[in-house]
Amino acid sequence: MKKLFFLLIFFGYLSAEINWSDPNECKLPDHSIFVNKIISNMTLEQKVGQIIMPEINSITPEEAKIFSLGTILNGGGGYPNQIKNSSIQDWKNLSKSYYEASPEVNGIKIPILWGTDAVHGHNNVIGATIFPHNIALGATRNEKLIKKIGGAVAKEVSSTGIVWTFAPTIAVPQNDLWGRTYEGYSENPDLVTQLGKNFILGLQGEGEDFLAKDFVLATAKHFLGDGGTKDGIDQGDTIVDEITLKNVHGMPYYAAIDSCAITIMASFNSWNGLKAHGNEYLLTDVLKNQMEFDGLIVGDWNGHGQVDGCEDNNCPEAFNSGVDIFMVPQDWEALYWNTLDQVKEGIISVERLDDAVSRILSVKKHLGLFDGRVPHNYDQNYVGDSSHKLLARQAVRESLVLLKNENMLPMNPNKNFLIIGEQSKNIENQMGGWTITWQGKTWEGTENYK
């Protein structure tokens, strides 16, 4: 009987509800009257178009206009017209084409919002400044430097007619076997919290500069537990109790939200067997309700298709769980029609659809897209700016780590040092992933790295 009593206490503890509540300290203008007026005049077709995000090489501006699409992206290795060596003007021209294809509701243009993975510089663009990856920036422990880097990246992204980046990654890697460990600042949640917060402030600006001309929309990612998967398996299962999930992997998101991050990306991984894209408890109950996140949740690359019972072109479960935008690179048209049918059939409620569209339009309003901000009209070119290169050099210097000091430091500037090893002259591997292509590899050699 005594054993049974202790077992009941133990399992009762495991099942106890964890309180994630925390006031959102980000105080932004309330645009609900403006947004609700637009939504009240939208058709179901226009609303569904807002929640679909295709990749630029699978949709034309003309198609985007027909389907009233709200967002697009270029993935790692995605370029205008599939031309890797596209010029800055090529990027801006494509941005203009999509902008001009934006849907209108009662004479109000709802600009298409373009997102990109500018994770260590504007890394898909030839000539952009490349900064060290987060694992190196974490070694600097320099919050002011991280904030400056965020500001530099924002200017380079803006220079190509884009105003949204899917960064920073605020994962808290717990197993170095994870192939994306290099995208995290540290295994220490406190350090990840501080550096992630400052990168967001650098990207978006703050105070009167919040999302002003030289700043872009940040995305905190990936929610939640991407750095804690069993055996470090990418997109695997994070098997931890809820207290650990909150205090380790969730900690950086509190600071991100308080710093006015208004887009968060859902994660590929599962938590205790349930895919994050289909986890209503985490996305809606925890993130949107308890943590008071009032921005939008964007899915990851076909992440919804990994939810049980779903496919890339069909997943009401993810949307009902709290994902506001489907990132669906290729199968966007089939997903559009399936989702529209599901709304008409009541599988997805109109109230849930309106909530998602409201979040999307509010973000666009905060970004100034309804108030004269035209991304492709950005009139300066900061791509590869000399001051940014100096900043990148500073980041490299401050991030270097000597693993074993046998009277090596301080280094004598009058001596010569031999750098050996295959990677010493492999610029591609030194740059790492997310550089020109997703895996950081070119197919023509290293002429693109200077």
What are these model-predicted stretches?
Residues 16-450:
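Glycoside hydrolase catalytic-domain context in secreted enzymes
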Residues 3-12:
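Sec-dependent N-terminal signal peptides
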